[in-house]
């Protein structure tokens, strides 16, 4: 399996997981269809599945066109069946989604939205976190509560440290400014910021991160308590 980052819209990331042996793929959160189709056509790959972490338009905007073009099945959270366009397959917390050679465990991680999920592709040691966990940050709380978001982050935090994190946006530089402002003596964070700057100078994605890196550097995962997390989230909203 190969994971390919697809840049979409202004700062979104969609992801293709490609089974190179079968020349088929699934796509995570297609913000728009065009860049996904271009990659698939350039590589002569057939799209079989569309996986959505949540219902926001910048994560499902390509569903309809991709489904019509490839006959791909759309997978999303059962509680969002009326909000995810073209949905076919409903999944819930702790389910294992397994089609072809694609296997992922589903975690329900409400907070950013009430129906947010992540896809943990355990064989690939990779988790697709949408807008819940970012590199050095976390998503804004639009529908859920502070408690829900904190507990959702704790679920992701518990994954193996070597797990790679693929999130929904390139927000890492701005997130790093907030982290260092509130964690000025964190040497691991200083090293990570240097690497982030080097990647961005070369127009490279700062993604993936890893659970280990986020445990060392992400102030939201290091907050310690729900109360501290809530205060930090409020500060970030006005940063």
Curated annotation (Swiss-Prot):
Coiled-coil region(s): none
Protein residues bound to Zn(2+) 1: 54, 56, 112, 131
Pathways involved: Secondary metabolite metabolism; methylglyoxal degradation; (R)-lactate from methylglyoxal: step 2/2
CC cofactor note: Binds 2 Zn(2+) ions per subunit.
Entry keywords, A to Z: Hydrolase, Metal-binding, Zinc
Catalytic function, reaction form: an S-(2-hydroxyacyl)glutathione + H2O = a 2-hydroxy carboxylate + glutathione + H(+)
InterPro entries, alphabetized: Clx_II_MBL (IPR035680), Glyoxalase_II_hydrolase (IPR050110), HAGH_C (IPR032282), Hydroxyacylglutathione_Hdrlase (IPR017782), Metallo-B-lactamas (IPR001279), RibonucZ/Hydroxyglut_hydro (IPR036866)
Residues reported to bind Zn(2+) 2: 58-59, 131, 169
One GO biological process term: methylglyoxal catabolic process to D-lactate via S-lactoyl-glutathione
Enzyme's top EC category: hydrolase
Cofactor requirements of the protein: Zn(2+)
SMART domains assigned: Lactamase_B (SM00849)
GO MF annotations, alphabetized: hydroxyacylglutathione hydrolase activity; metal ion binding
Listed EC numbers: 3.1.2.6
Family of this protein: Belongs to the metallo-beta-lactamase superfamily. Glyoxalase II family.
PANTHER family to which the protein is assigned, alphabetical: HYDROXYACYLGLUTATHIONE HYDROLASE (PTHR43705), HYDROXYACYLGLUTATHIONE HYDROLASE GLOB (PTHR43705:SF1)
Protein purpose: Thiolesterase that catalyzes the hydrolysis of S-D-lactoyl-glutathione to form glutathione and D-lactic acid.
Assembly and oligomerization: Monomer.
Protein name in the entry: Hydroxyacylglutathione hydrolase
Gene it is expressed from: gloB
């Amino acid at each position: 399996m190969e994971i390919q980052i697809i840049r979409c819209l202004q700062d979104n990331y969609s992801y293709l997981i490609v089974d190179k042996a079968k020349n088929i793929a699934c796509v995570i959160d297609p913000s728009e269809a065009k860049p996904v189709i271009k990659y698939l056509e350039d590589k002569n790959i057939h799209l079989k599945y569309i996986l959505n972490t949540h219902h926001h338009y910048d994560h499902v905007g390509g569903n309809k066109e991709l489904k019509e073009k490839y006959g791909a099945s759309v997978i999303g959270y059962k509680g969002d069946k009326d909000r995810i366009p073209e949905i076919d397959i409903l999944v819930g917390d702790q389910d294992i989604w397994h089609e072809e050679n694609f296997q992922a465990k589903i975690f329900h991680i409400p907070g950013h939205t009430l129906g947010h999920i992540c896809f943990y592709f355990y064989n690939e040691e990779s988790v697709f976190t949408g807008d819940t966990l970012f590199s050095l940050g976390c998503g804004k709380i639009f529908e859920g509560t502070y408690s829900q978001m904190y507990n959702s982050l704790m679920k992701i935090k518990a994954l193996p440290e070597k797990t790679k994190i693929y999130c929904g946006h390139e927000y890492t530089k701005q997130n790093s400014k907030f982290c260092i402002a509130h964690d000025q003596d964190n040497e691991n964070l200083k090293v990570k910021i240097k690497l982030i700057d080097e990647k961005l100078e070369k127009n490279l994605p700062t993604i993936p991160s890893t659970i280990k890196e986020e445990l060392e550097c992400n102030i939201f995962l290091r907050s310690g308590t729900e109360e501290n997390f809530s205060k930090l989230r409020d500060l970030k909203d006005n940063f």
